[in-house]
């Protein structure tokens, strides 16, 4: 679980090993776009996949020996991608549930960034399985990190710290 100071509050989250690395191991960007268009996000794929890139998970389940589940692989690549996207969405839903179990207030909506934000089928699958509205924001790579860095420098300056002379910003 990670906590980041943002403005006057905290942004809490969890870092799973699951993510787009698995998708990139299996499909090119062009294939992801083409296959995604073939997915009906309102229907279940019927697959129960756990798309980890390697053995081990850290959130929402802390288990260094947790095995990826990438089979059965159907003949249809579109159906396989559908199942992988659902698997990622289920892991995300478990993460939100785990955060609430630990005392985080329930989320009202999610804001998604990056490449996945441009995939309407995946966004809808996530909405269906997580149960929250998801708003897409398409921003350049690393824009979020750049904003956090800018906020940290502004905070340091406001507190009288010289960012160039400090190895650690508040």
Short names for language-model regions:
Residues 1-110, 118-141, 146-169:
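Active-site core segments that coordinate phosphate-bearing ligands/cofactors
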């Amino acid at each position: 679980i990670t906590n980041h100071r943002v403005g006057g509050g905290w942004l809490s989250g969890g870092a799973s090993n699951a993510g787009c690395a698995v998708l990139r191991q299996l499909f090119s960007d062009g294939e992801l776009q083409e296959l995604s268009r073939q997915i009906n996000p309102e229907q279940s794929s019927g697959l129960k996949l756990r798309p980890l890139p390697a053995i081990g998970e850290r959130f929402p389940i802390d288990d260094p020996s947790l095995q990826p589940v990438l089979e059965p692989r159907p003949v249809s690549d579109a159906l396989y991608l559908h199942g992988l996207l659902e698997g990622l969405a289920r892991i995300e839903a478990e993460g939100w549930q785990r955060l609430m179990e630990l005392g985080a207030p329930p989320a009202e909506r999610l804001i998604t960034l990056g490449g996945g934000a441009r995939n309407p089928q995946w966004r809808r699958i996530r909405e269906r399985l997580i149960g929250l509205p998801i708003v897409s924001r398409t921003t350049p790579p690393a824009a979020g990190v750049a904003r956090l860095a800018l906020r940290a420098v502004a905070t340091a300056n406001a507190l009288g710290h010289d960012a160039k002379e400090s190895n650690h910003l508040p």
